[in-house]
Amino acid sequence: IYIMRHKFGYKKLNRTSEHRKALIKNMLNSLIKYEQITTTLPKAKVLKPQADKIITLGKKNNLQNTRALITKLQSTVSANKVKNTLSKRYESRKGGYTRIIKAGFRYGDNSPMAVIEFVDRDVKAKNIDKKTKETNKDKSPNEQIKKEATK
């Protein structure tokens, strides 16, 4: 039996369109920032082609693509990292910038979990962010404000 492929376009993830777009955008920003995130398997499968398209967009370095990156990610920090770091890392690679590794099942609801990460990722990317958080924890909020004001 053959069925017509109507409404087979994309996974809805049981969310409204705006919620789904926001979810994908937030996950893309987290993936770019930390270069590895743990999420459910269906979300990782939706995120993989989106992340690959973002890297491909960043590889063609022109104003139009820069604006498209900023529009898609809603973050100039993430857009700059894609343009300056990730696009240089993957300039010899034609595609397949991310990989999905199955990571068992979540305790509580038994959801299949997965780790999505960039191929040849920078292992230090996650640690750098943790170090800055730890140094900021040690200081009082007033000291942090003074430090930022002197920059």
List PLM regions with ranges.
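Structured, basic alpha/beta domains of bacterial-type, RNA-associated proteins
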Residues: I3-T150
